[in-house]
From Swiss-Prot:
List of residues binding S-adenosyl-L-methionine: G106, L111, I157, E158, R170
Name of protein: Ribosomal RNA small subunit methyltransferase G
Subcellular location(s) per record: Cytoplasm
Family statement drawn from the similarity comment of this UniProt entry: Belongs to the methyltransferase superfamily. RNA methyltransferase RsmG family.
Signal peptide: none
HAMAP family per UniProt: 16SrRNA_methyltr_G
GO MF term set: rRNA (guanine-N7-)-methyltransferase activity
Catalytic activity: guanosine(527) in 16S rRNA + S-adenosyl-L-methionine = N(7)-methylguanosine(527) in 16S rRNA + S-adenosyl-L-homocysteine
Broadest EC class assigned to this enzyme: transferase
EC number: 2.1.1.170
Keyword entries, A-Z: Cytoplasm, Methyltransferase, rRNA processing, S-adenosyl-L-methionine, Transferase
Length: 238
């Protein structure tokens, strides 16, 4: 996907970390600024990532914006805004995720699946979406970024019959709907993890409370002023 004919770009240095500008197309002269915003966010979130992992996150952002029109990946086109609202927003859940194999349903452009796969190369990640074009993008970017732990699948959740230790989603407006479609894909001792703006409502707790144990984690996403929560649900009677 990269365009090697583009003019040379300014390199980005973060302390003793150097981000090689080779291969970047859309980020251009903003690369140093974006690299520093990312590094500061990683530090604030308490995540340990190598220089290569940080570069890979920025390459993903670059390709997301480059191929956005062709694949209809995101409504956000400004690189700084996309970095904060997509990449850093997903980074905020990394330290809170239970261990084990992971399925991300309704993954869209691969959020949070690709971000998790970059940060946790030891974890097996499956990105599931019924949109063929978006899965083609994830397949291509996973190959280019060397994400051997990523498996993109174009399918509806109802037709996917594998069980996972962790099932995530960033796409569902309703927590109840997410639980309904995700539960059949969850291993017995597994966890459902929903990225949400607000904490669970009283109605959601009432409907789900008999069968599910709730853990609500308030997320502090660097540079994002919107309310963000990770809702973790596990079976009460296992």
């Amino acid at each position: 996907m990269s365009d090697s004919t583009k003019p040379s770009l300014p390199s980005a240095s973060i302390g003793n970390i150097h981000i090689d500008p080779t291969g970047f197309v859309k980020l251009g002269a903003q690369l140093p600024t974006l690299a520093n915003i990312l590094a500061q966010a990683i530090d604030e979130l308490g995540i340990t990532l190598s220089a290569q992992q940080q570069r890979t996150l920025l390459l993903y952002l670059d390709q997301l914006l480059l191929w956005n029109k062709a694949y209809n990946l995101t409504a956000i086109t400004d690189p700084v805004e996309a970095l904060i609202k997509h990449v850093i927003d997903c980074l905020a859940i990394i330290t809170h995720l239970p261990s084990g194999s992971l399925l991300d349903i309704g993954t869209g452009a691969g959020l949070p699946a690709v971000i998790i796969a970059i940060c946790q190369p030891e974890r097996s990640c499956t990105a599931l979406d019924s949109n063929q074009k978006k899965i083609r993008f994830i397949k291509q970017i996973s190959s280019e970024l060397g994400l051997s732990n990523m498996q993109p699948i174009a399918s509806r959740i109802e037709a996917h019959e594998v069980s996972y230790d962790v099932v995530t989603s960033r796409a569902f407006a309703s927590l109840i709907d997410f639980v309904e479609v995700a539960q059949p894909r969850l291993a017995d001792n597994g966890y459902l993890c929903a990225m949400k703006g607000k904490a669970p409502s009283e109605e959601e707790r009432h409907v789900l409370g008999n069968d599910w144990q709730f853990k609500t984690i308030k997320l502090n996403v660097p540079r994002l002023h919107d309310s963000r929560h990770l809702i973790e649900l596990s079976y009460k009677n296992v």
